[in-house]
Amino acid sequence: MPNLVTVVGENTHILPHMLKHYEDVIDKAYVAVYRQSDDDGILEEIEELGIEPFMVFTEPKYNWERVTEIYNTIKQTKPNDWWIVSDDDELQVYPEPIEDIIENCERNGYEFVTGGFLDRIGIDGTFPKVTRETDLHRTFPLAGFFRHPMSGACPNKVTLMKGYQKVTSGQHYASFNDGTNSWGTEHKRRMPIEECFTQVHHFKWDSTCVERIKKVADNKKDYSFSDEYKIMYDAIKKNNFKIDTNNLKFLVEDMKELSYIEYKDYPHWD
């Protein structure tokens, strides 16, 4: 089975649900804790959750490039293992068992698997409150693809890879030693998307997301992608702090299965 690596920062309440989602398909979870200052209380929150961090690092707020460096560093501790790289608000879903996908990759010389975001939101485009007891599937019954058309954010993700395979900032592409990356629809080391394209169900959109998006926008740093966050914040504000579920570009649909995530449930995944 693969390992899992994730980085958790100021938003910890999705983390228990995320770890629960992966627990039966991974060998071990490696949790890195991102402290934003020396008096950041996140370590106490992680302790309350019963999680032992693999690594703790302190960095200025919203440095997504540093987060990616941490992912690459931790994966290198077991370079020949397979790893799932998942942010703490992402629940990845594969079209077949992960062990079968890894076997296919080993047999054909593929070194990484890719996918894309599905944005999960509440009824009528709202941003629900999440606690440890929340049933994510029923609380976020809508899935769509709105962040890219809304603000131009890259929707691609590298989800499963060998430990030595580095990823670019945001985990959007595989990064190679010659300075190139896996941008494009095909790469000889990439499992073809016709065989596997991972759904990354993004539960970013909870009751705290507007405040968090505003903070990143106000950070005004290139490494935070603050310009994109400002566009996103303004678009959400314009729609009364909800997602416009009637916007056809956002491809918002009701998920039929509300006890788990069914890969074939979302009708526009093609």
Name what the model sees in each region.
Residues 7-9:
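N-terminal catalytic cores of NTP/NDP-binding nucleotidyl/phosphoryl-transfer enzymes
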